[in-house]
Amino acid sequence: MSILALVEDRPTPKEVYNWKIYLLAAVASFTSCMIGYDSAFIGTTLALSSFREEFGFSTMSKTAVNLVSANIVSCYQAGAFFGAFFAYPIGHFWGRKWGLLFAGTIFTLGAGLMLGANGDRGLGLLYGGRVLAGLGVGAGSNITPIYISEMAPPSIRGRLVGVYELGWQIGGLVGFWINYGVSETLAPSHKQWIIPFAVQLIPSGLLLIGAVFLKESPRWLFSRGRREDAIKNLCWIRQLPADHIYMIEEIGAVDQALEEQRTTIGLGFWKPFKAAGTNKKVMYRLFLGSMLFFWQNGSGINAINYYSPTVFKSIGLHGANTSMFSTGIFGVVKTVVTFVWLLYLIDRLGRRLLLLIGAAGAAVCLLIVGAYIKIADPASNPTQEMTGGGIAAMFFFYLYTVFYTPSWNGTPWVMNSEMFEPNMRSLAQACAAASNWLWNFLISRFTPQMFAKMEYGVWFFFASLMLLSIVFVFFLVPETKGIPLESMDVLFESKPIWRAHATVLAKLREDEEQFRHDIEESGYSKTGEQQVEHVSEDLPKV
């Protein structure tokens, strides 16, 4: 088998790979467009002279400016931290669809509040709006990956959850370029900096409109006892009748997983909290999920996202427009590489190998950039044009982006969406998303101070964390590509970790062959023509 071949846990009818599943993933991923845009535009907006003049940055000390900038950026992450947890009861009781509508509504209210800010009113409305927007994206970062993973066929689950990451990068691309556009085309004014804030309403509006038409997650419906609705939605998504053998297998696996949960963790609202504190298997996976986001943020990527002018200045780029243009190129590179990751790598090369390769390559590039800054000290020796060493440093910076983006950028979100059983999934994803926003908050809050105090040492610091992540992934993180959600317990119990995927996949294929043999022995047609009453229960074929 080719290393880039799709991995199927069982023969999958071509009808399963239909446009509906991609459409649902795309609509849900407007949440990540909100996140990506908000993460990208704020740093360069704070660098606009019109914004700095209106809010009196010119009268503040450098320390005060760094503090205010860090507060504006980081209150968004603080809101997102709590939003990730608030989404748990909504997703549990009301479902994934209503959770997405909640996220879009709160974000829209926050974006609208920010539009009321000006020099006379001060920064209060910006702070309040950023916190509300953070609550919205925190909720969305919890619910969206779960929603997509619960609908996705195992063989393309990484690709579909990857659409969430693609939305993040597209939003980021717009956010990186919009300030360059307004700075080049508009004179410094209130209008110049308020336009980037207003654009936030576009992805949230699209989410609110699209989410109305989304199908509820079949697995959530099963967990709530709404079996008829669950089978109907699953048939619509898979484009197969309820009595097709593929559907019988999938529904049977969900039933079995729910029964196992009922006898172990339990299906109530509070049961997952008890499991999170007492069940060693659950605690271990929560630890893995949180640490994946620790290493992701330890790559330094969010320091670049939020403070790109500061980052590029440390390499030797001078001038606001030059930094904004370089930031825009950074966004283009991330988006292009994300397409490659989405279409060819995540479900073919897998999660584990991508993380290992990405960490090694990113670490080398960060070390080279840090060494250049240490030797050349471009901040203390500015030149009109970049030197050859500076150009090489920029090359390795963009090469770092190429290594990081198809590995650590989206893969932790994919893995956290698929590691847990159904009733644990909402709380576990809440913990994982909150963990991401916690590390994100710390990076965004202290990056200006780190660059002021550590200078080139910041690059070595992030490189060291990337090297340590290699050890973590190799010994503790199993490969999950192609493994059904209902078989994750077996995967994480298999040892050694680096062979677990092959072991479990072989067992799944053996069980599937036996299941089909038993079905055929009982007189069931391979084409699914015979009615299977305990599954379809008088549902019409779709």
From Swiss-Prot:
The keyword Transmembrane helix applies. GO terms for molecular function: carbohydrate:proton symporter activity. It comes from the Eukaryota. Residues 523-542 are annotated as: Disordered. It holds the Pfam family Sugar_tr. It is a multi-pass membrane protein. The chain crosses the membrane at residues 23-43, 75-95, 98-118, 131-151, 160-180, 194-214, 286-306, 326-346, 353-373, 388-408, 457-477. GO terms for cellular component: plasma membrane. Gene3D superfamilies: MFS general substrate transporter like domains. Residues 531-542 have a biased composition (Basic and acidic residues). InterPro entries: MFS_dom, MFS_sugar_transport-like, MFS_Sugar_Transporters, MFS_trans_sf, Sugar/inositol_transpt, Sugar_transporter_CS. It is found in: Cell membrane. Residues 44-74, 119-130, 181-193, 307-325, 374-387, 478-542 are extracellular. GO terms for biological process: quinate metabolic process. Its main location: membrane. The keyword Iron-sulfur does not apply. Residues 1-22, 96-97, 152-159, 215-285, 347-352, 409-456 are cytoplasmic. Keywords: Cell membrane, Membrane, Quinate metabolism, Transmembrane, Transmembrane helix, Transport, Ubl conjugation. Ubiquitinated. Deubiquitinated by creB, probably to control its activity or amount. Integral membrane transporter that imports quinic acid to be catabolized as a carbon source. Belongs to the major facilitator superfamily. Sugar transporter (TC 2.A.1.1) family. Interacts with creB. This is Probable quinate permease. It comes from Aspergillus fumigatus (strain CBS 144.89 / FGSC A1163 / CEA10).
